[in-house]
Amino acid sequence: MVRETRVRVARVYEDIDPDDGQRVLVDRIWPHGIRKDDQRVGIWCKDVAPSKELREWYHHQPERFDEFASRYQEELHDSAALAELRKLTGRSVVTPVTATRHVARSHAAVLAQLLNGR
């Protein structure tokens, strides 16, 4: 039996989609222009974000994405924050949200793949 995809990815600035389930902000830094009580955030799990060093090294250079994804997965290997997100995905649909413009080449996309078991 194929497991249903329970993790989606979105920009925090997008309107809430009814299929989003629990939205989880996965950025280390709070997004500009978003109030702390904004419903588009859901819960904030900054500890699952890439380290400052890795984020600065990657700096959204597409040619570095594969290496970034590999390094980020290594950072998450024994992450308690990732373990908490895994528990959440077992109970409901989860949508990691990020302020990143290019969501498909972001840590949120890598995180979604991990949580979906890919």
From Swiss-Prot:
Pfam families: DUF488-N3i (PF22752). It comes from the Bacteria. To E.coli YeaO. PANTHER family: CYTOPLASMIC PROTEIN (PTHR36849:SF1), CYTOPLASMIC PROTEIN-RELATED (PTHR36849). This is Uncharacterized protein Mb3100c.
